[in-house]
Curated annotation (Swiss-Prot):
It catalyses: tRNA(Leu) + L-leucine + ATP = L-leucyl-tRNA(Leu) + AMP + diphosphate. It comes from Paraburkholderia xenovorans (strain LB400). A motif ('HIGH' region) lies at residues 42-52. This is Leucine--tRNA ligase. GO terms for cellular component: cytosol. PANTHER family: LEUCINE--TRNA LIGASE, MITOCHONDRIAL (PTHR43740:SF2), LEUCYL-TRNA SYNTHETASE (PTHR43740). Its main location: cytoplasm. NCBIfam families: leuS_bact. It is found in: Cytoplasm. It holds the Pfam family tRNA-synt_1_2.
């Protein structure tokens, strides 16, 4: 073997062999247990980042460990290829999104292959391929037939200059990101999916999932099952008796209502603004605000009195009606009761507009003040006051009594509501799955016949930011009605890209199938392990769970959850550096452009920009991102140190679920360790290749210690592999190398046995180096390729010791150690301890009062 470790040569050779035998192509077999591990498919943005490297290495380590343990393992890969970033890049570069996307896929695939990942590329999926999105369209039509998909009007952000719909993130301070125009809210017809139909099941099935508790809680909160009361405030308008309906989880505070607020889109708001220009103007202002719940939570709360009142259902008092920009028509009834004494948002609203505050819940020992909000105001722990016949009741009692009274009056009743809303899947964008609907002036909306699927998206259009290019493509839009044969037009909306990512893992399992999925999906799915970032905890993971239940109900799959287990890997962090100009604008500099100075304790105290030698501000450690310019290009790392070093570093630096802080010295350390592994193998090549056999009863002390250390560490490493604690697995391999390095005089047969254990423990993390050494040292001739070499078994006899070492304490302080027979009696241990020279030294001639023995651990002499 070569004297020097050259990562590029080693990795090229290993990958060449794997390609030659199609090492990771996987089929369905019945004589092995299966394991299906999937990393969330990436968006083809152009280059891999360190977060990708970490995610895919975790998956790869899992794959290799399980394959060595006799599992039939599948690790596929694909591309979440539709979406708005491709359109933006296309505009910036004046190229079709398709070209930009396919070029990026080719480059990123090459990067993944350079990492040596155990991916079965025969199952590769790109969601922008007609062969894939045909099944988005097919399932959409099936859902339309079953009433799971339906059409209704929905509110969107409309840019009046660019004449296009904007996503929420494209609205900045109420203006279009590109045109700068004030954004309007518009009602347009869109398609929705009845995810609310599955709300109970989505909530209840969380319990059986091996997912992080944090993710489960986030989904529970998003689904948001609420027990409350739905009731109405009576009013009369235009000679008609009506009810202003609200839903509340705090019916106990109904006697504290001092106003009601309605959404700008509420029918009552429209009616009340009929002859009031000020109200009309305010309603238009509200409509220009964000349409997302997150926008409403952070925006300034504004309101305008309508001059109209409704009647309190229990007190008959007149209650003012306001229009509020924080009330969404799409949530609840589009109206809320205002109880400022016990709701923080209402409290802030009335402080701004001078409305009354009426306390109706008291907590013993706490004093209420209208001057400032206190957390306890909103708690359910008190009893009612200022509430007439309900005074003295606690929360549960009050809700029951008030709900019963409202029901008796015919004005309300208890109700379960959900925060979850149906999923709007229409997007007024070009680069997405075309919705398979034809609009006929005679027949109305006509589904595209199954035989005509897929409706193929033209790939040669270039967006210019003004409207949807599809709507301007006559070749796409103009068609024939499949029902009457007359001239018709295609739907130009495309599907939300979350549709694409809701089922790709089933298509991996059925590559080339003539149906959406086939029996191979039943073999592989559900996923045994899914790996991805916590940022996908709600939308992607919730939609994929919904999709599984729909596909199950349509008879396509036999299960209702996509993934048994979920690992949310931590973020990759790095230092940030910036300068700020007079206007407050920050310019961020990459760590590679900066030289940092440290104090005598190694803490950073300053930094300068290499280009001009002037100071930059230390911005602290943050997630690697383009916006903070603190990313590290994985390709540079691989080119300089090799893929194995990159893999070793990202596995060793932190447990998979925790954040990983980038460290240049850590990378150097990983590279240095791999060079040590190579050097040890090269220096001992002759002995390791010689091998032979040995009699365990005739081992030297050095050999006993070596085998005991190797198998003791193997036992822990095996446990750590099973619980996905790969950082401590790397520590185990380091301990093994230290033990081998220290075993001077050990015979070749013992060295060969123990080195084979180390190589196999290290292999899942560092596959190229270990694969090469396995061959160079002759292990492949004996045990077969390292790809399928048997996982080493712990030799329990090697762990047995005739003697053990106990910590020696005098008056509770460690003073040394004593070696005793493993089966030594308590009396023998006490005698040895009492006679030890360190006891004589620290007892000052005093006789021991007592000797405490903790079996297997320590002995404490008390004087």
């Amino acid at each position: 073997m070569h004297e020097k470790y050259v990562p590029s040569d080693v990795e090229s050779a290993a990958q060449g062999q794997w390609r030659a035998i199609d090492a990771y192509k996987t089929t369905e077999v019945t004589d092995k247990p299966k394991f299906y591990c999937v990393s969330m498919l990436p968006y083809p943005s152009g280059k891999l980042h360190m977060g990708h490297v970490r995610n895919y290495t975790i998956n790869d380590v899992m794959y290799r460990y399980l394959r060595m343990n006799g599992y039939n393992v599948l690790m596929p890969m694909g591309w979440d290829a539709f979406g708005m970033p491709a359109e933006n890049a296309a505009m910036a570069n004046n190229v079709p999104p398709a070209k930009w996307t396919y070029d990026n896929i080719a480059y990123m695939k090459k990067q993944m292959q350079s990492m040596g990942l155990a991916i079965d590329w025969s199952r590769e999926v790109a969601t922008c391929s007609p062969d894939y999105y045909k099944w988005n369209q097919w399932l959409f039509l099936k859902m339309l037939e079953k009433g799971i998909a339906y059409k209704k009007t929905g509110t969107v952000n409309w840019d009046p200059v660019d004449q296009t719909v904007l996503a929420n993130e494209q609205v900045i301070d109420g203006r279009g990101w590109r045109s700068g125009a004030l954004v309007e809210k518009r009602e347009i017809p869109m398609y929705y999916m009845r995810i609310t139909q599955y709300a109970d099941e989505l909530l209840n099935d969380l319990e059986g999932l091996g997912w992080p508790e944090r993710v489960k809680i986030m989904q529970q909160n998003w689904i948001g099952k609420s027990f409350g009361v739905n009731f109405g405030f009576p009013y009369e308008i235009d000679g008609e008796q009506k009810l202003l309906r609200v839903f509340t989880t705090r019916a106990d505070t109904i006697m504290g209502v001092t106003f009601c607020a309605i959404a700008a889109e509420h029918p009552l708001a429209t009616r009340l603004a009929k002859d009031k220009p000020e109200l009309q103007a305010f309603i238009e202002e509200c409509k220009r605000g964000g349409v997302a719940e997150a926008d409403v939570a952070t925006m300034e709360k504004k309101g305008m009195a309508t001059g109209f009142t409704v009647t309190h259902p229990l007190t008959q008092e007149q209650v003012e009606v306001w229009i509020g920009n924080y009330v969404l028509m799409s949530y609840g009834e589009g109206a809320v009761m205002g109880v400022p004494a016990h709701d923080e948002r209402d409290f802030a609203f009335v402080k701004k507009y001078g409305l009354p505050v009426r306390q109706v819940v008291a907590v013993e020992g706490k004093e209420f003040s209208t001057e400032a909000w206190q957390e306890w105001y909103g708690e359910k722990t008190g009893t009612l006051i200022n509430s007439g016949k309900y005074d003295g009741l606690n929360y549960e009692q009050a809700v029951d009594r008030i709900a019963a009274d409202l029901k008796e009056l015919g004005l309300g009743d208890k109700q379960i509501t959900w925060r979850l809303r149906d999923w709007g899947v229409s997007r007024q964008r070009y680069w997405g799955t075309p919705i398979p609907i034809i609009h006929c002036p005679t027949c109305g909306d006509v589904p595209v016949p199954e035989k005509d699927l897929p409706v193929v998206l033209p790939e040669d259009l270039v967006p210019d930011g003004t409207g949807n290019p599809l709507a301007r493509s006559e070749a796409f839009v103009n068609c024939t009605c499949p029902t009457c044969g007359g001239a018709a037009k295609r739907e130009t909306d495309t599907m939300d890209t979350f549709v694409d990512s809701s089922w790709y893992f089933y298509r991996y399992a059925s590559p080339g199938a003539k149906t959406m999925v086939d029996e191979r999906t039943d073999y592989w799915a559900p996923m045994d392990q899914y790996i991805g970032g916590i940022e996908h905890a709600i939308l992607h993971l919730l939609y994929s769970r919904f999709w599984a239940k729909v596909m199950r109900d349509l008879g396509l799959i036999r299960f209702g959850e996509p993934a048994k287990n979920l690992l949310t890997q931590g973020m990759v962090l790095n230092e940030t550096y910036y300068r700020e100009n007079e206007a407050g604008k920050k310019t961020w500099y990459n760590p590679a452009e900066v030289t940092v100075s440290f104090d005598d304790k190694g803490r950073p105290v300053g930094a300068i920009l290499n280009e001009d030698g002037q100071p930059v501000v230390l911005g602290g450690v943050e997630k690697m991102s383009k916006s903070k310019n603190n990313g590290v290009d994985p390709q540079l790392l691989i080119d300089q140190h090799g893929a194995d070093t990159a893999r070793l570093f990202v596995m060793f630096a932190a447990p998979p679920e925790q954040s990983l802080e980038w460290s240049g010295s850590g990378v150097e350390g990983a590279s240095r360790f791999l060079r040590r592994v190579w050097s040890f193998s090269q220096a001992n090549e002759a002995a390791l290749r010689q091998g032979g056999t040995f009699d365990a009863a005739q081992l030297s002390d050095v050999e006993k210690v070596l085998r005991r250390e190797i198998y003791s560490v193997l036992k822990q490493a095996d446990f750590d592999y099973q619980r996905l604690q790969y950082n401590t697995v790397v520590s185990a391999a380091m301990k093994m190398l230290n033990a081998l390095d220290s075993a001077k005089g050990a015979r070749p047969a013992v060295l060969r046995e123990t080195c084979s254990v180390m190589l196999r423990v290290l292999y899942p993390v560092v596959p190229h180096l270990t694969f090469q050494l396995w061959q160079e040292l002759g292990y492949a001739d004996e045990l077969g390729s390292l790809l399928d070499a048997p996982w080493p078994k712990v030799d329990e006899k090697a762990l047995e010791q005739s003697e053990i070492e106990l910590v020696l304490q005098v008056n509770g302080k460690v003073r040394g150690a004593i070696t005793v027979a493993k089966d030594a009696s308590r009396e023998a241990i006490e005698q040895l301890a009492a006679a030890h020279e360190m006891v004589a030294k620290f007892s000052e001639g005093k006789a021991p009062k007592k000797i405490v023995v903790v079996p297997g651990r320590l002995v404490n002499v008390v004087v």
